[in-house]
Amino acid sequence: MRSAQVYRWQIPMDAGVVLRDRRLKTRDGLYVCLRDGEREGWGEISPLPGFSQETWEEAQTALLTWVNDWLQGSEGLPEMPSVAFGASCALAELTGVLPEAADYRAAPLCTGDPDDLVLRLADMPGEKIAKVKVGLYEAVRDGMVVNLLLEAIPDLHLRLDANRAWTPLKAQQFAKYVNPDYRARIAFLEEPCKARDDSRAFARETGIAIAWDESLREADFTFEAEEGVKAVVIKPTLTGSLDKVREQVAAAHALGLTAVISSSIESSLGLTQLARIAAWLTPGTLPGLDTLHLMQAQQVRPWPGSALPCLKRDELERLL
């Protein structure tokens, strides 16, 4: 016997979270909980403002329609990426397809004073991989900060994310301030330029490896082995169903590319599922899930080791 609940939620964000020039004051989303007999499965639907095609309200309408269809015996999935992902996660839990084992390691997101960062990163246990957002300030400053971190910590590897912020000239200004001897320890730089060809040229000219992120969601993108391209960053909330995520990971691995499962600032419930997906589909690759600290609370399922308060399901607004 099938049954379902849908919950709507809103989590206050820390001050200073800015996405594409917009301040994100709250993270808004939905949960779906599916039951079939004794089995239960949860999924999170949280379109990311400025990145998702669909709004929260559109996702809610699509989710409620899909849930009603599922209750009537339908087996299809919605079209909207965030709804397809959340619904497919709930089904994957319900049917036991999504393993319980999780990779709760996270490449820490580096913000703040570079000298403080050096101290923090130097004390990191195990493999030292960290993420730095670039393109928010002057390219020269970004280059100097990255160079400082790599110089101060000889076993540090950095993942950089420019979100297509640079012109080819600015990208070159960044590279100019990174010692060529350290560039191999830049694991990859996500989407340095707006145009893919400019990003490819940057990789060839500087020897700094790049990764595709936004490109994966463009209609003309195809998976190819290319000089200077080392990785793809997959954000399931923006991608679609779990099957589509699996297809993209498989396509990347077939070409020898690293596939990184990455957060779209999901709640703790969604992040714990992404940690399980990462352990399942990309074992051995550190996922990009260090975003919980941007929020003021957890919900339903806590992230191991987090001190943030965690709301229970009965504290959420139920829609169905």
UniProtKB/Swiss-Prot annotation:
Pfam family name, one: MenC_N
UniProt entry tagged with the keyword Lyase: yes
MF terms in GO: magnesium ion binding; O-succinylbenzoate synthase activity
Annotated active site: 133, 235
Binding positions for Mg(2+) per the UniProt entry: 161, 190, 213
SUPFAM superfamilies: Enolase C-terminal domain-like, Enolase N-terminal domain-like
Catalytic activity annotation: (1R,6R)-6-hydroxy-2-succinyl-cyclohexa-2,4-diene-1-carboxylate = 2-succinylbenzoate + H2O
Entry keyword set: Lyase, Magnesium, Menaquinone biosynthesis, Metal-binding
Enzyme Commission numbers on file: 4.2.1.113
Cofactor: a divalent metal cation
Top-level class of the enzyme under EC nomenclature: lyase
Record GO biological process: menaquinone biosynthetic process
Superkingdom of origin: Bacteria
Pathway involvement of the protein, from the record: Quinol/quinone metabolism; 1,4-dihydroxy-2-naphthoate biosynthesis; 1,4-dihydroxy-2-naphthoate from chorismate: step 4/7; Quinol/quinone metabolism; menaquinone biosynthesis
Keyword GTP-binding: no
Family according to the record: Belongs to the mandelate racemase/muconate lactonizing enzyme family. MenC type 1 subfamily.
Function: Converts 2-succinyl-6-hydroxy-2,4-cyclohexadiene-1-carboxylate (SHCHC) to 2-succinylbenzoate (OSB).
HAMAP family: MenC_1 (MF_00470)
Record protein name field: o-succinylbenzoate synthase
Provenance organism: Salmonella schwarzengrund (strain CVM19633)
Underlying gene: menC
